[in-house]
């Protein structure tokens, strides 16, 4: 139900994103019964993919009040129901709410697009066979922290609108902490040993080529900054 698809080439170890309105279906059926039995790890990874869709769409330079409303709806559902869907896979309400979260996030990024996190995820996934949601999880917090000077207001607003409980006034840092807490709750990795030092220069070129060609990012990243984030992820 989104405008995007990705083609993986096992010979070149590349993933190519495709975007065309013809990919958008006339109708999508969200049946939570089909999700019962989905393993906890895949539930967690795909949930983080949906979270990444929503967050990247919210901070996109193409964001609108409509797309940001869809992003907020998705993020609120994910924070509340993803831990339950992971821990209690047979919970039909949690499965339904996560299906709706994925739907809302898809509506958001179809119109507002994505960002550096997906450029990292596509290329780490293609090179090393990492699951897409896991790769998004590796890149999401580092990219948000890199972009923070340009997106602090947006993340503060997300902290407020997603009802994060804090003793102080909600801040961008509170939103980042909420994501980190979600990672801990559902077992999402924050770093990987898969990245090879000899691959970093090539990965930087591929990541920046994809992001700068396709995505309306809030803060541009140069080669040195991209390499530092890859090293951080591989620590």
Role assignments for model-derived ranges:
Residues 3-112, 218:
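Carboxylate- and glycine-rich phosphate/diphosphate-binding segment that chelates Mg2+/Mn2+
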Residues 36-38, 57-61, 85, 105, ...:
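Alpha-helix C-capping/helix-to-loop hinge sites
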Residues 38-40, 62-67, 141-143, 163-167, ...:
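A ubiquitous short alpha-helical element
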Residues 51-55, 98-106, 120, 140, ...:
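Short alpha-helical scaffolding segments that buttress acidic/His motifs in well-ordered protein cores
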Residues 69-73, 77, 97-100, 119-122, ...:
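Amphipathic alpha-helical interaction segments
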Residues 112-174, 180:
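C-terminal catalytic subdomain
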Residues 155, 162-235:
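C-terminal charged capping/lid subdomain of soluble metabolic enzymes
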């Amino acid at each position: 139900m989104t405008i995007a698809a990705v083609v993986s080439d096992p010979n070149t170890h590349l993933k190519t994103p495709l975007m065309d309105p013809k990919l958008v279906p006339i109708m999508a059926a969200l049946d939570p019964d089909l999700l019962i039995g989905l393993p906890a790890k895949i539930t967690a990874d795909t949930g983080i993919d949906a979270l990444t869709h929503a967050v990247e769409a919210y901070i996109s330079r193409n964001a609108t009040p409509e797309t940001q409303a869809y992003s907020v709806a998705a993020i609120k559902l994910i924070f509340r129901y993803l831990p339950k869907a992971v821990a209690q896979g047979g919970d039909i309400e949690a499965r339904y709410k996560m299906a709706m979260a994925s739907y809302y996030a898809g509506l958001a990024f179809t119109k507002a697009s994505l960002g550096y996190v997906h450029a990292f995820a596509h290329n780490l996934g293609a090179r090393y066979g990492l699951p897409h949601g896991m790769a998004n999880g590796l890149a999401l917090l580092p990219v948000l922290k890199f972009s923070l000077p340009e997106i602090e207001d947006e993340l503060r607003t997300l902290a407020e609108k997603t009802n994060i409980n804090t003793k102080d006034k909600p801040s961008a840092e509170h939103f980042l902490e909420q994501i980190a807490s979600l990672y801990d709750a559902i077992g999402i990795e924050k770093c990987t040993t898969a990245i090879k030092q000899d691959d970093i220069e090539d990965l930087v070129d591929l990541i920046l080529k994809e992001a700068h060609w396709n995505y309306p990012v809030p803060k541009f990243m140069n080669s040195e900054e991209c390499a530092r984030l890859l090293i951080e992820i591989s620590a």
